[in-house]
UniProtKB/Swiss-Prot annotation:
Protein name: Alpha-conotoxin-like RgIB
Gene Ontology CC annotations of this record: extracellular region; host cell postsynaptic membrane
Similarity-based family: Belongs to the conotoxin A superfamily.
Keywords from the UniProt entry: Acetylcholine receptor inhibiting toxin, Disulfide bond, Ion channel impairing toxin, Neurotoxin, Postsynaptic neurotoxin, Secreted, Toxin
SS bond partners: 5-11, 6-19
Superkingdom as given in the UniProt entry: Eukaryota
UniProt organism field: Conus regius
Function: Alpha-conotoxins act on postsynaptic membranes, they bind to the nicotinic acetylcholine receptors (nAChR) and thus inhibit them. Is a specific blocker of the alpha-3-beta-4/CHRNA3-CHRNB4 image nAChR and may also block alpha-3-beta-4-alpha-5 (CHRNA3-CHRNB4-CHRNA5) channels. Has possibly a distinct nAChR binding mode from other alpha-conotoxins, due to a different three residue motif (lacks the Ser-Xaa-Pro motif). In vivo, causes hyperactivity and behavioral disorders in mice following intracranial injection.
Comment field on protein domains: The cysteine framework is I (CC-C-C). Alpha4/7 pattern.
GO-annotated molecular function: acetylcholine receptor inhibitor activity; ion channel regulator activity; toxin activity
Tissue expression from the record: Expressed by venom duct.
Length: 23
């Protein structure tokens, strides 16, 4: 899930815009 991805520094760094869009 995006939530799990955003919790992962490496994954989040690759999807910063997506993670910032997820509240």
């Amino acid at each position: 899930t995006w939530e799990e991805c955003c919790k992962n520094p490496g994954c989040r760094n690759n999807h910063v815009d997506r993670c910032r869009g997820q509240v």
